[in-house]
Amino acid sequence: MHELFLDIETSGLNPDKHSILSIGMVVSLNGLIDYQSFYREIKHDELVVAPEAIEINKYDFTTQKNRVPLVAADEAAVIFLKKYYRPDEKPLPIGLNVGSFDMQFINRQMPLLSAKLSHRAVDLNSLMYMLAHKHSKDFKELKKELSDKAHNEVSGFALGVSKHNALYDAVFNLCLYLMIKEDFIS
């Protein structure tokens, strides 16, 4: 499988109105033991910002240091993917709400990356819903249990970032996916 663990942070919920603030991607070479990551913060001259989005992702608008234009981030993301996938491969985005949220922004705002990715996506919420059914558990209870376990594991990686950072959340998605996959196999 051509998995790609993906997360973005945005200035709001509407991909036609709001902007991608940062993107994190993770390619797993050997589970959590060996993975490669990509992270960029995006520089914008103008932004439409939904206050609730900033409350969640705690984005700092006071500095543009280390931020790149969206076009440069789009190009760099494709260069990153070319290191790990053959030209004929279309990596499958995996994450929480990745198809219904993240990919809507990527399809509109990062056309080079969008063209490189599969048009399909795997939403980890759907897989957890299936696991909840398998174990006769409440979905929200199972999601909290697995999320807490994944956060505890990812927090130990000393990434230098925390929850609601696109890189942290991409690694979190990988960890959560591996736990779900292991449960399905057992």
Can you annotate each of these PLM segments?
Residues 47-56, 139-151:
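Short, flexible, mixed-charge acidic loops at enzyme active sites
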Residues 122-137:
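Short alpha-helix plus adjacent loop in nuclease-associated cores
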Residues 93-96, 104-109, 141-186:
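Acidic, Mg2+-coordinating catalytic module of metal-dependent nucleases/exonucleases
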Residues 15-17, 32, 105, 131, ...:
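Short, function-defining helix-loop hinge/capping sites that tune catalysis or transport
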Residues 2-4, 9-100, 155-158:
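Conserved non-catalytic scaffold segment of RNase H-like nuclease domains
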Residues 101-120:
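Substrate-recognition/cap helix-loop segment adjacent to the acidic, metal-dependent catalytic center
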Residues 7-9, 102, 123, 169:
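Acidic active-site catalytic centers that drive phospho-/nucleotidyl reactions
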Residues 114-118, 137-142, 185-186:
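Short conserved catalytic/interaction loops centered on acidic-Pro-aromatic/His motifs
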